[in-house]
């Protein structure tokens, strides 16, 4: 299990692992069961930085740090999937052509435009928070977006033969329960630590999982299934949904 965790950590994040790992495809393909734990690590790093130095700089500065930190710690892995997915979806081509576009390394104008709007909305959400709320939100966002990733892998058919095929073939009901448990424990723990309403965090968690499922179901219609790029894209969109949800739920005074 430790080897599986570390192999996944080197793939899903840029966090260095000491020593040399003996690669095992079988163990690597099981790594998504630790997706929420990887989110705890990356989100924890960013939250700790903000907690330690949050009072030294204004909130709009930390909003930029959060976005840059998320991109760096993930190696832009999910962003690449988001851009490829948007290019394919908004190409208005048939299913086979869309799948070809997913494999194209070039980025189209639609993807660039949508990604610009994505960054503005994400930045605006985080910039609206105090440093303490920023630290809390980036922590739960990193956990939840990866937790929903396993839900999507498990719930929808895979199309193609790229890297994500191994993740899909090894997804199981036990793995789904395990990742749900991690996500629930980690987010509730974060809420308790930051003195955030447990009811609110449960609402956000439920809405985020529902959001990821609905997006995945819609994208499945475009591609006849999902690919590894789609997995990353859906996780990125969920990573935007969470801070927006925190902002809206706090402002409208839900519970």
Swiss-Prot record:
Gene Ontology MF, one: cobalamin 5'-phosphate synthase activity
Main location: membrane
EC number of this enzyme: 2.7.8.26
Parts of the chain that traverse the membrane: 33-53, 57-77, 107-127, 136-156, 174-194, 196-216, 234-254
Any Pfam family hit: CobS
Keywords (A to Z) from UniProt: Cell membrane, Cobalamin biosynthesis, Magnesium, Membrane, Transferase, Transmembrane, Transmembrane helix
Parts forming coiled coils: none
GO CC annotation, single: plasma membrane
PANTHER family attached to this UniProt entry: ADENOSYLCOBINAMIDE-GDP RIBAZOLETRANSFERASE
Recorded family membership: Belongs to the CobS family.
Protein name: Adenosylcobinamide-GDP ribazoletransferase
Gene: cobS
